[in-house]
Amino acid sequence: MKILIIGHYPPHKGGVANHTNNLVKELRKKHEVHILTYGPIKPRKFEREFVHQVKVPQIFGLRGILFTFLAALKTIKLQKRTKFDVIHAHYVGTTSYAGILAKEKLNAPVIVTAHGSDLDFMSNLPLGRYFVKKSLSKSDLVIAVSHHLQKKAISMGATKIRVIPNSIKTIKKEDAKREYITFIGALTPYKDPQTFIKLAKQFPHEKFLVVGNGPLRTDLEKRAPKNVKFLGYKEDVGGILSKTKLLVVPSLREGFGLVIIEANSLGVPVIGRAVGGIKELIREGKNGYTFKTFEELVEKVEILLSNKKALKMGKIGKTISSQYSWERIGHLIEESYREVLGERNDNCNKHARKGRLEENQSSCEIY
């Protein structure tokens, strides 16, 4: 198959960029994969032929909108030259709507993946909500990374939807003493790092680690007790998780919570707020605990610090995380492509039997 991925991609950073990067690596084992992303960027040498970009100015509030319309035009242009079988847009809103706008001119289905912050953030903006609803209702298939997002997408107009979770690349464990209670994530309000700092004050004899950057960092550093260490953003979390005995995820909302699977893969138990995708990933008392109040959080931390249950949870977590390999997730996504293409072929055959193939030719051709 020839596949076009639309969305953030390295050197861009963040969850979506990491996801598309790993998905592309997996799909390229069997298929020709191209990427259309935000520019200007300097693609890696080995993939310059396959990475296309839309250069958009850094204008706050307008960059995403400009990308939408310019990326739609670029997609149509690329399709005429390359003839993709599938267009797969990541992040519902400005990115996905680029594919939807181009869809009438394309000879390929458009698939959209909802990652979490897209439905939460974009749907709160008037124009963003329009982009989201159109993308969900007009796409050939919506992929949600959790059942929580699936329900939300259906409530906003998605009709054809499938749950395929995020995945993780293999993380190498380093030989290190597990001595830290760790937070990994952006230092933004919805990740609620303030609760983590508050927790550190309750356990003055424990070592706490904050991994990530964001607008709240300066204020957090001022308020943090001496037992908290700030490391900033780290691309590779393997070394950090190898030193971690407990991961805390206090996010106020979360579409999936990839860091939970990453921690589990190295045998680290997780305590996370009982919201969104976090509730789906943490199996109570098996690979961690969930909490609703700060008092519950303190209680769960005390339980894991005071007995050997954390060691047992770590072993169970490793087993659970093995279900989220990129080989498996990549296969499920590839399977979705084939299902959508198969349905289009079926529709084409129906039109042919009714003698209407010619008038429906543009929507039936599969290259």
Where does each model-flagged region fall?
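Conserved donor-binding/catalytic core segment of Leloir-type glycosyltransferases
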Residues: 4, 174-203, 208-211
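Aromatic "clamp/platform" in nucleotide-sugar-dependent glycosyltransferases that forms part
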Residues: 233, 252
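Short hydrophobic beta-strand element within catalytic cores of glycosyltransferases
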Residues: 260, 269-272
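Conserved acidic donor-binding segment of nucleotide-sugar-dependent glycosyltransferases
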Residues: 284-285, 289-295, 303-308
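N-terminal subdomain of nucleotide-sugar transferases
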Residues: 1-41, 201, 326, 364-367
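A short, well-ordered alpha-helix in the C-terminal region of glycosyltransferases
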Residues: 309-323
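Donor nucleotide-sugar binding/catalytic pocket of nucleotide-sugar-dependent glycosyltransferases
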Residues: 112, 122, 129-172
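An amphipathic, basic-hydrophobic alpha-helix
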Residues: 48, 60-86, 94-101, 105, ...
